[in-house]
């Protein structure tokens, strides 16, 4: 049986559907989202909440001529379905499939790549300015969630947009704030009617007449404007946006399609920047997601009937969970330890800490720059702040790490979760640059554990260290090894030798250490004897251990789940060069100079050649070429 959704291959097809049938289309899309995401995993709650909003935008605007910029982008599933990607939607976030985020290389309807938060208004304003410079007339719409509005860049963009007065529509998708029904209903009515073309033309005519009345006309006009502003401020929460120079419409019921269509059609005709404030419900239409939207923010495969995860068995505890438990253990012994996160208490494993130590836990919102400098302030006053943040998001606070932490040598701990490849979220979320961008900062100590037990000891080391220190660990389950109950400090800058051999030294860091050890066993079966070193520290390196291995073998393989440029392997090369050991052959294994796409972590590691099989094969091939002439300190990638 054909459905409304079956008739849509592009936004033009959507516009052929009668308005009174759009609510039925919304329900079909929700059913499709549940069916596919329950099998593939993905971001569910946020997408269920913006179905009507996405339909209304594509119904009232003309993509791709009109530009849509989706902040963060994980809520763009309906947008993708309506723009010709329904037949490939079952591949979203899968290896070789379509992205879970907007991607310009994927569709002309994806106007701007997103993945990190709070960028949409800045990008949209840039597009609006480009339109003005070209003499164009297309519309630009930035869709941003209330959570992303906690990011400073969003307000920086609002400030300039209000100053420039260019046509830009900002849709504030508010799924958290509670507005009482009466005020919300009346305000929706006022916003729809007072922004209609008839009212605005009438308003202009009245203003013109008042200005021409001798003596008192201008005074009456000023009084009328004050009255209008006071009324709107009383009726709506839009005073901030209006103070920044925006027209404000809302709040609007975000699941009422007739209302959304009317408002967006009115907004199209406004001159200057405008904010359309839309109230939505995360998880709309699926009770488990509405009840617990956080649990259905990012999900794996699940049973639609029960909402319970399927296809996975309980395994080893995650690195994230062990980090959170260990930090709480340390905090019981040291009242100076405080925890900071940027809107990710669940994702960084700090919910338990927050419950046990609510006065020592700080969720600063999506404000990574503030999180780092806030931590610096706490450290300056004698506390031991632990800033738990995804590796990819710390990039947003680089200047604060330099200026506010390292320059003052303050004891801030950076707990970098999701270090390395993260899997299905792809290039915007892989944490593969931290070893490079932190290593060269003076005073920074940088370490990565080989397993979850070493993570615990490294965290103990970090909170005891007098200076900035970063600890990076991967996404996912640990190795399932027993955990030491007594925590100990690891001497700064010390590695450990896990295996000894004279043919080659494999020096690995973090998640690549155990694969390196497994690779050594494979090589041993072929008569190749390898020394395996768990470096533990990227900065400072265990100089003597590495130099001794270089002297012993004359041949070094480095392994890391980080960009090769400026990473761990580069640090080893620099050490050898500084010591004049130009006869040592070096091959670096890691992430080449490209962005890594989405896919299961094991698949990505295999593709990059940093799993056990890849390390063994690269080592064997490198040794086979050992007799051939090679430049000193060969930087083979």
UniProtKB/Swiss-Prot annotation:
Domain of life per record: Bacteria
Reactions catalysed, as given in the entry: D-glyceraldehyde 3-phosphate + pyruvate + H(+) = 1-deoxy-D-xylulose 5-phosphate + CO2
PROSITE patterns associated with the record: TRANSKETOLASE_1, TRANSKETOLASE_2
Pathway where it operates: Metabolic intermediate biosynthesis; 1-deoxy-D-xylulose 5-phosphate biosynthesis; 1-deoxy-D-xylulose 5-phosphate from D-glyceraldehyde 3-phosphate and pyruvate: step 1/1
GO (cellular component) term, any one: cytosol
Keyword Disulfide bond among UniProt keywords: no
UniProt cross-references to CDD domains, sorted A to Z: TPP_DXS (cd02007), TPP_PYR_DXS_TK_like (cd07033)
Binding site for thiamine diphosphate: 74, 115-117, 147-148, 175, 286, 368
Entry keyword set: Isoprene biosynthesis, Magnesium, Metal-binding, Thiamine biosynthesis, Thiamine pyrophosphate, Transferase
Example GO BP: thiamine biosynthetic process
Similarity field: Belongs to the transketolase family. DXPS subfamily.
Summary of subunit composition and partner proteins: Homodimer.
Function recorded in the entry: Catalyzes the acyloin condensation reaction between C atoms 2 and 3 of pyruvate and glyceraldehyde 3-phosphate to yield 1-deoxy-D-xylulose-5-phosphate (DXP).
Name the record gives this protein: 1-deoxy-D-xylulose-5-phosphate synthase 1
Species name: Geobacter sulfurreducens (strain ATCC 51573 / DSM 12127 / PCA)
Organism lineage: Bacteria, Pseudomonadati, Thermodesulfobacteriota, Desulfuromonadia, Geobacterales
